[in-house]
Structures are given as structure tokens and as C-alpha cells.
């Protein structure tokens, strides 16, 4: 028997019926009383996003939990995620009242709210939207700290041990008649954040807001202490609520979810090694069924795999109709990633405690708020967008004639979302050594998957230089062309049809478009890229013993056949090519 069960009377069904009828009468009375004079529903804005911080309060989301306690706590955190989306970014005009319920609306399953812990008539019971008092309590505390005028606030009638109710700093809510309302004579802004383990509430506003002393304690008599435990752990198995509570909230301790996009062999191996039975993998498509190698992730036995098939097919269809380069292509690609992320967000179970996410989906999931209250790792596939755009700007400054280096820049809100999400991530996982160096100790370096070596062929005539990319500025095409024009006696072959249009630097060079198999007869692979995220052909060349000349930005592993230059530079590149080709040229002369 639970140690507290003998201290309490067993709740009866008639009490619940009476409570239901009483609350409906109070709700009706509030609705009628406010006809024509309800507080306004406020909108989100960015006018005060840089305003001074007036107050900030934090509260723990999670505590040490038993499997029996976990489901309702996970439901509470999910309810807070939904509520945070409703309140974050609200800006309230001077003199206007902020009403908790007017802003959030009724908590229903249709809106995504789940069963959480709710204090009701001396019991902690499962209730749709349960746990939102943690948010209302923090809102009350920051309003007090910022000196806002409290219009309406109610304390709990029972005290949860260790809670803010012991200091009369709580604020209970119950649709719609038990509300929290406050206002200021100057404009102010609400910001809500769920970190891995905390709920954070901030108020921003114009300095000079009226300061108000905290109100006197609102309780006429000390609240009664609440016995510990909820419907799942209180020990009162004879209670009418107990059977349904146990049936609907099976003991659990959470699981991890892997939110994946295009397959990298390095990430596939890492995810398989770090999965456990009960975890879930989300992929765009069943790569084996659809014969799509880029989606052929290999989930271990015991892992549930789900797919965003319709979203992935729409993305694939849209990509086929896009030009090879340009702003339109990048915008459509981002929209496709956003749709995949939205689908994954709907599939995430509230009991998921940890997420592993492909980087391209990260900013969209962050903006959706589903990473709040969870720890997460990021599979780093590329430079952060902000850093990537900085590098493109640097390349454009060096080659202002380029038609591609400045064709697209992401919106600031997307950059900010990725910046915030990367800062909040637990681990940044990548095989790319340049990315790892950029993030320093936060990076978790995993080894590149080296390909099977290819059989080599001896070329006749001039040495063959292999450029494994299209003739684009970001791949170092301008630097390579200038290096070749400096007097290097070699044939150049490149991959891909995309180019710089009227600014094509390869015009006039002894070069031709090649195929992947041309690498087998190459004297060297050249990749002087400003940006290169997945240097697969360079890895194949190294594995096959072919010299590779590349920038550090390519992130390649140390190798005896790797010759690196610090950054794209035509002079340094020409010298390196000449040095690597010298033995080949000597052999040809002999």
C-alpha cells in the first residue's frame, strides 16, 4: 500500500459528477458575464524582439521518474510545447489585458493536447491539457518581477511539496473561469522556450514600465498539503479512476527517434550503432521498396521504421521540374525539407525523450517547437547556412562576375532558427573534418566510409586532371581555370552540365566533360572548392591511390595521397598541381 493511501478518503464517482456539473455552471457564468467585453486575443510580432529583458523565470520540466510516473509527465511536456507555440512572440499593446485562456483557447485532443497531471479536489489526476499550471505559474512570476498589473490570479487549494505554491507564487487555471490576467501601461512581449530540461519564460518591454509591488498573499488560510503520487502511483487501486488511468498510461521510460533524410553511409552506421530496441526511425521513403539508394537506411532489428512517403514523393516531383541552379531551386528544396519536417513532427510520439536529426530538417523542426523538452543530436551534412552564405559572399567578392555565387540567400528567420537549434544541440556528429574544426569540442567526429578501390588505367599522352564537379564558382572553377591558364600542360575533364553561363571560366581551356569512370586514368583529382560537403569521388580517388589536390574546406581525412591548400587560390593551386604532376611528366619525357 502507498504510504499516503490511508490518509485519504477514496474518491467516488458521484464526487466527479458533482465537480463536472459545478465547473460547467461556473464556465457558463463566465461566458455570459463577458459577452461583448472579453479581453482581446493578441498577435505575434517582432517589434519588441530586441527590447530590454524585464524578467525571466525557469522551472524544471523533468525530474527523476519511475516508469509509472513517466507517461503523465511526458503528456505535460507535450502540452507545454503546444502552449509555448501559442504564447511565444506575443506582443501586447499598452493597457491591453493578456488573458491566458483567451490566448490559448480550450485544451482539446483535436488541438493535440494530451493527458497530463492535473490537481483536482485533492488528487493529481490525468486530464487533457494537464500540467499547464507550470506555464501559468511562471507567467505570473515574471509578471510580478516585471511590475505588471495583476488583474486576475488564483492559487492552488492544495500544495504539491516543493512547488512554488509553498511561497504563494503559483497560478492555477481551469477553463475558462479560473484565469490568469495581467497588463502594463507600456508595450511588452512574451517569449517561451523549452530547453532540454527547463521551461523558460521571459518578458521584454520598453524600460520605464510601471513597477507594482507584489500583491499580498491571496489565500485566506494556509493551503492543505497534497499527498504525493498521482493516479498511477497513489496506491488507491479501489478508486474509480484507477483502472482507466492504468489502461491509458502504460509504464514507460521513453525512447529515441531518428529523423533522417538522405542517407550517408557514415550516418547509417552511427545510427545503427546507437539505436536500441523500441527506438523509431523516420525516413522519407522505403528506399528498398522504391529502389532509391539515397533512402536505403538500414535500421537494426527491433526498430520501428516509419516514412513520410507522400511528402517525399511531392518533393521528388517538384525537384524534377527545377532548373539546375538558381534561387528558385533553393527555395523549392527548402520547402520540400519543411514539408518532410512537418510530417515527422506529426509522427513524433510525446514519449520520445531524445532525437537524432538530419541537419537540413533541423531549423524547420526547431521552428515547429517539437525539439523543446528533448535532448537532440544533429547529423551535420553541411556548413550552417549562415557560415555557408559567408563563404559564398567571400567567393563572390573574389569573383564578382559569377552568375551563381550570389543567386540565393536564406531568410533571416531560418538562419536564426538553425543558429539557435545548433547551439541547443547535445552533439554535432560529422565525418567532415572542416566542419568538425569549425565546431571545435562540440563536434563528434566519425570516420569517413572509404569506398572499394577502383582498378586503374594508364593514360596515353598528356596527364589527365579530373575535376569531380560542375563548372561552378563554389566548387573552385574560377581558381582551377586560372591555374590551368598559367601554363599547366594537362588535359582537364569535369563532371556535370551546370556552369556559370556567360561567366564560364572554362572557355578556351583544353577540357571536356567526362564521366565517373575517367577517374581511373586520371593523374590527379582536383577539387579547390569553397564549399564541398560530400567529397565522395575524392574519397574514391584516395582509396584507389590517385593523388587528390583539394582545399581544407572539403573536410577530407589525412592520407598520403592528399595534397591540401588552405583556401581556393589559383597560384597555390597551380604550384601544387605542377608539383604533383612533375613525376608523371618526367615519366612521359623518358
PLM regions with names:
Residues 234-311, 485:
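N-terminal subdomain of nucleotide-sugar transferases
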Residues 316-327, 378-413:
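Acceptor-binding helix/loop patch of EC 2.4 sugar-transfer enzymes
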Residues 339-347, 384, 397-427:
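Membrane-proximal helix-turn-helix segments that form the acceptor-binding/catalytic region
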Residues 407-456:
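Donor nucleotide-sugar binding/catalytic pocket of nucleotide-sugar-dependent glycosyltransferases
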Residues 454-475, 481-485:
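Conserved donor-binding/catalytic core segment of Leloir-type glycosyltransferases
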Residues 530:
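Aromatic "clamp/platform" in nucleotide-sugar-dependent glycosyltransferases that forms part
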Residues 547-550:
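Short hydrophobic beta-strand element within catalytic cores of glycosyltransferases
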Residues 562-571, 578-584:
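Conserved acidic donor-binding segment of nucleotide-sugar-dependent glycosyltransferases
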Amino acid at each position: 500500500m502507498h504510504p499516503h493511501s490511508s490518509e485519504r478518503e477514496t474518491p467516488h464517482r458521484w464526487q466527479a459528477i458533482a465537480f463536472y456539473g459545478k465547473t460547467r455552471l461556473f464556465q457558463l457564468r463566465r461566458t455570459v458575464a463577458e459577452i461583448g467585453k472579453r479581453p482581446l486575443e493578441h498577435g505575434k510580432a517582432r517589434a519588441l524582439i530586441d527590447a530590454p529583458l524585464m524578467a525571466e523565470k525557469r522551472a524544471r520540466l523533468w525530474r527523476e521518474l519511475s516508469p509509472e510516473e513517466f507517461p503523465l509527465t511526458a503528456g505535460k511536456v507535450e502540452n507545454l510545447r503546444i502552449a509555448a507555440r501559442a504564447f511565444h512572440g506575443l506582443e501586447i499593446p499598452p493597457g491591453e489585458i493578456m488573458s491566458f485562456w483567451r490566448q490559448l483557447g480550450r485544451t482539446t485532443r483535436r488541438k493535440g493536447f494530451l493527458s497530463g497531471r492535473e490537481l483536482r479536489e485533492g488528487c493529481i489526476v490525468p486530464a487533457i491539457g494537464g500540467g499547464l499550471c507550470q506555464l501559468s505559474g511562471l507567467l505570473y512570476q515574471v509578471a510580478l518581477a516585471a511590475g505588471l498589473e495583476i488583474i486576475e490570479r488564483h492559487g492552488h487549494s492544495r500544495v504539491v511539496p516543493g512547488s512554488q505554491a509553498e511561497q504563494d507564487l503559483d497560478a492555477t487555471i481551469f477553463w475558462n473561469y479560473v484565469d490568469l490576467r495581467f497588463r502594463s501601461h507600456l508595450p511588452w512581449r512574451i517569449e517561451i522556450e523549452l530547453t532540454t530540461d527547463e521551461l523558460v519564460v521571459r518578458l521584454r518591454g520598453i524600460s520605464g514600465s510601471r513597477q507594482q509591488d507584489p500583491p499580498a498573499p491571496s489565500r485566506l488560510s494556509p493551503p492543505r498539503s497534497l499527498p504525493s503520487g498521482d493516479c498511477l502511483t497513489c496506491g488507491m487501486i479501489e478508486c474509480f479512476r484507477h483502472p482507466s488511468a492504468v489502461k491509458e498510461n502504460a509504464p514507460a521510460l521513453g525512447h529515441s527517434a531518428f529523423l533522417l533524410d538522405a542517407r550517408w553511409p557514415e550516418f547509417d552506421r552511427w545510427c545503427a550503432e546507437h539505436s536500441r530496441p523500441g527506438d523509431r526511425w523516420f525516413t522519407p521513403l522505403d528506399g528498398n521498396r522504391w529502389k532509391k539508394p539515397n533512402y536505403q537506411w538500414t535500421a537494426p532489428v527491433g526498430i520501428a521504421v516509419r516514412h513520410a512517403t507522400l511528402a517525399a514523393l511531392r518533393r521528388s516531383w517538384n525537384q524534377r521540374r527545377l532548373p539546375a541552379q538558381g534561387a528558385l531551386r533553393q527555395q523549392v528544396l527548402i520547402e520540400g525539407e519543411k514539408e518532410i519536417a512537418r510530417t515527422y513532427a506529426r509522427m513524433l510520439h510525446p514519449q520520445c525523450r531524445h532525437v537524432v536529426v538530419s541537419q537540413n530538417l533541423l531549423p524547420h523542426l526547431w521552428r515547429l517547437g517539437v525539439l523543446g523538452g528533448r535532448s537532440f543530436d544533429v547529423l551535420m551534412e553541411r556548413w550552417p547556412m549562415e557560415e555557408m552564405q559567408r563563404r559564398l559572399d567571400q567567393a563572390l567578392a573574389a569573383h564578382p562576375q559569377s552568375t551563381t555565387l550570389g543567386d540565393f540567400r536564406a531568410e533571416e528567420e531560418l538562419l536564426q532558427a538553425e543558429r539557435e537549434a545548433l547551439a541547443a544541440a547535445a552533439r554535432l556528429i560529422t565525418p567532415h573534418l572542416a566542419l568538425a574544426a569549425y565546431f571545435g569540442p562540440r563536434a563528434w567526429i566519425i570516420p569517413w566510409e572509404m569506398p572499394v578501390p577502383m582498378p586503374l588505367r594508364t593514360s596515353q599522352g598528356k596527364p589527365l586532371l579530373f575535376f569531380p564537379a560542375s563548372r561552378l564558382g563554389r566548387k573552385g572553377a574560377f581558381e582551377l581555370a586560372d591555374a590551368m591558364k598559367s601554363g599547366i600542360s594537362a588535359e582537364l575533364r569535369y563532371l556535370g552540365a551546370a556552369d556559370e553561363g556567360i561567366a564560364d571560366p572554362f572557355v578556351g581551356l583544353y577540357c571536356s566533360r567526362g564521366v565517373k569512370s575517367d577517374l581511373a586514368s586520371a593523374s590527379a583529382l582536383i577539387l579547390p572548392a569553397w564549399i564541398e560537403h560530400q567529397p565522395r569521388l575524392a574519397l574514391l580517388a584516395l582509396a584507389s591511390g590517385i593523388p587528390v589536390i583539394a582545399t581544407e574546406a572539403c573536410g577530407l581525412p589525412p592520407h598520403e595521397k592528399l595534397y591540401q591548400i588552405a583556401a581556393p587560390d589559383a597560384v597555390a593551386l597551380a604550384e601544387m598541381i605542377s608539383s604533383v604532376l612533375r613525376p608523371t611528366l618526367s615519366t612521359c619525357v623518358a
